[in-house]
């Protein structure tokens, strides 16, 4: 019997990564309000709380029978969280701050089915090139970065801004396959069985 997997996300990047496999899934956007959770100084705990909150909101709103998969990605630099920018100007300020620097990207993945909850996370280090400030506005406009934490995308124009990625590149896109693989095994779902 095919597993019932529910991707609790409106992210086209997460959907695209999951589509690398033949595993059937449906998408439900969580109603969880991310901005309602204050950052308390622990980026892993923060990311996990957001991922679990998304999964729990899907249970509350839809009560599906399948395995709910949610994730949350945060950018951390010098102890500060860079979520999705609220405006064009905020995205530019984020890029200025990260220019020429190394920051961390933490993605927490939560799987929830009935009362069974499994959570894991992945951390990746990303180093930016020194960015020419006069082009940052064009970058934000060209690649619609307001829906991306940190105000940037590795897939769209990433080569212009990223010097180096240490760790899982899928983590930077919002869904670390290695972490997902190990968590799905806890629900008797093996991604190796769903290779295209």
Swiss-Prot record:
Glycoprotein as UniProt keyword: no
Q: Where in the cell is it found?
A: Cytoplasm
Enzyme type, top EC level: hydrolase
A Gene Ontology biological process term: nucleotide metabolic process
Gene Ontology annotations for the cellular component aspect, listed alphabetically: cytoplasm
The UniProt record lists the EC number as 3.6.1.9
UniProt cross-references to Pfam families, sorted A to Z: Maf (PF02545)
**Keywords in alphabetical order:** Cytoplasm, Hydrolase, Nucleotide metabolism
One GO MF annotation is: dTTP diphosphatase activity
Give the site residues for Important for substrate specificity: 13, 73, 155
Q: What is its main location?
A: cytoplasm
Q: What cofactor does this chain's UniProt record say it requires?
A: a divalent metal cation
The residues responsible for catalysis, as annotated, are 72
According to UniProt, the reaction catalysed is: dTTP + H2O = dTMP + diphosphate + H(+); UTP + H2O = UMP + diphosphate + H(+)
Residues annotated as coiled-coil are: none
HAMAP family (alphabetical): Maf
- What PANTHER family does the record point to? BIFUNCTIONAL DTTP/UTP PYROPHOSPHATASE/METHYLTRANSFERASE PROTEIN-RELATED, BIFUNCTIONAL DTTP_UTP PYROPHOSPHATASE_METHYLTRANSFERASE PROTEIN-RELATED
Record family assignment: Belongs to the Maf family. YhdE subfamily.
Record function comment:
Nucleoside triphosphate pyrophosphatase that hydrolyzes dTTP and UTP. May have a dual role in cell division arrest and in preventing the incorporation of modified nucleotides into cellular nucleic acids.
Know the name of this protein? dTTP/UTP pyrophosphatase
Lineage here is: Bacteria, Pseudomonadati, Chlamydiota, Chlamydiia, Chlamydiales
């Amino acid at each position: 019997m095919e597993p019932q997997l529910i991707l609790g996300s409106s992210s086209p990047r997460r959907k695209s990564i999951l589509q690398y496999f033949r595993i059937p899934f449906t998408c439900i956007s969580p109603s969880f309000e991310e901005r309602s959770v204050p950052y308390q100084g622990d980026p892993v705990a923060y990311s996990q709380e957001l991922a679990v909150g998304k999964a729990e909101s899907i249970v509350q709103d839809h009560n599906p029978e399948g395995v709910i998969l949610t994730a949350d990605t945060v950018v951390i630099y010098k102890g500060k969280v860079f979520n999705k920018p609220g405006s064009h100007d905020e995205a530019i300020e984020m890029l200025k701050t990260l220019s020429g620097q190394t920051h961390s990207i933490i993605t927490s993945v939560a799987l929830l089915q009935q009362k069974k909850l499994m959570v894991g996370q992945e951390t990746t280090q990303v180093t930016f090139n020194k960015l020419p400030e006069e082009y940052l506005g064009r970058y934000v406009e060209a690649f619609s970065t307001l829906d991306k934490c940190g105000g940037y995308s590795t897939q769209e124009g990433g080569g212009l801004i990223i010097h180096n990625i240490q760790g899982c590149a899928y983590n930077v896109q919002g869904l670390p396959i290695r972490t997902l693989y190990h968590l799905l095994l806890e629900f008797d779902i093996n991604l190796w069985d769903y290779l295209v």
